[in-house]
Design a protein with these regions (language model features):
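Hinge/lid segment of periplasmic solute-binding proteins
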Residues: 1, 68-124, 138, 181, ...
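Extracytoplasmic "Venus flytrap"
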Residues: 2-23, 43-44, 121
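Short, well-ordered beta-strand elements
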Residues: 3-14, 34-39, 62-63, 114, ...
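Extracytoplasmic "Venus flytrap"/periplasmic binding protein-like
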Residues: 23-98, 130-141, 242-244, 251-252, ...
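Hydrophobic residues within well-ordered alpha-helices
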Residues: 50, 146, 153, 183, ...
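Extracytoplasmic/periplasmic solute-binding protein
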Residues: 105-118, 123, 147-207
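Glycine-centered hinge/linker elements that transmit conformational signals in sensory
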Residues: 150-152, 197-235, 275-286, 294-305
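Glycine-rich, aromatic-lined ligand/substrate-binding cores of catalytic
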Residues: 215-218, 223-226, 240-266
Length: 308
């Protein structure tokens, strides 16, 4: 039906997103005749390139694969197509099979559908269960636990190659995806009443929730965890840490769901050695009036489990 036509897609370069689109695109072309032309750019450049292209009306790209947090910036000026009627008419899409959060939040704005989720982005903590079991250690339930475990394993040979390895591997590269990770670390110190209570701003008065002991605690974690990571940790991103973790060089990491299939892929050194869990939390949260950390109680932290 679409023989001779080409669709231009922009996303981040490298294997993590661009390559899977190319791989699946081959089957798409077989089914439709529509060819796919991929443009891969550094993660730090995707937003600006899309915004510039759309705003100038150049229209070099038909499709963008990007984090949903940017969606509103493209919708309000009218750059994205309202997909609502097309989605509802396409029975093969099976829209209701998409998890409600990603269907209603990540893909929709103001009651209309503007994007199709490629995956469901949420962070998890991953750990070498073989190492922790051998040492009689439990997986981390708090970020303090995470640091304690990372310190314990740092500098030890974790994959049997005779070289010292690392307690923790986190992608901290500037203009990379490290800001997602530090937000996940800060969240339990800032937000204890559910997502409606806000994280970056207090919804009651719109004052920033940054200059407080909670975010300071997250930055302290960032600094200390660097002591237990690869020597170049401040210059690596998640694409690098995934390879480090699956080669057996890291006791802990924080990532999206990608670690799961990568850990059991051909060549992985950690097959059947990886555990995962909901992100560690905190036994303290900020008092929003004072900005100080206070201990969790049932009223302060109603969603806590065992005080975390």
């Amino acid at each position: 039906k679409y023989d001779g036509m080409t669709i231009n897609i922009i996303t981040t370069g490298g294997y993590t997103i661009k390559q899977p689109i190319i791989d699946h695109g081959k089957k798409f072309t077989e089914l439709t005749g529509l060819k796919i032309n991929m443009t891969g750019v550094p993660f730090s450049d995707i937003y600006s390139k899309m915004l510039t292209d759309f705003g100038a009306g150049t229209n070099s790209y038909d499709v963008g694969v990007f984090p949903p947090a940017w969606m509103v910036d493209f919708i309000v000026p009218g750059y994205l197509t309202d997909l609502t009627s097309m989605v509802k008419a396409d029975k093969k899409l099976n829209w209701n099979d998409v998890v409600p959060f990603f269907r209603d939040f990540s893909a929709s704005f103001d009651g209309k559908i503007y994007t199709i989720p490629v995956d469901g982005d949420f962070h998890m903590a991953y750990y070498r269960k073989d190492l922790l079991e051998k040492e009689g250690m439990n997986p981390p339930t708090t970020w303090d636990d995470y640091l304690r475990i990372a310190k314990h394993f740092h500098g030890k040979d974790l994959n049997g190659d005779g070289e010292a390895d690392w307690g923790s591997c986190l992608g901290k590269k500037r203009n990379g995806q490290g800001y997602y990770i530090i937000n996940s670390i800060a969240a339990p110190y800032i937000q204890s009443q559910g997502t409606g209570s806000g994280m970056f701003f207090n919804p009651e008065n719109m004052k920033p929730l940054v200059n407080n002991e909670g975010f300071a605690k997250a930055l302290e974690f960032w600094k200390e965890s660097t002591q237990y990571g690869p020597p170049n940790e401040l210059n690596i991103d998640v694409g690098d840490t995934r390879g480090m973790f699956t080669s057996g060089r890291c006791a802990l990491t924080v990532d999206w769901g990608d670690i799961g299939p990568l850990a059991i892929a051909e060549g992985s050194k950690v097959v059947d050695k990886v555990g995962s869990l909901v992100l560690p939390g905190s036994k303290e949260v900020i008092d929003r009036k004072t900005g100080k950390l206070v201990s969790c109680t049932k009223s302060i932290c109603p969603h806590a489990v065992d005080g975390v």
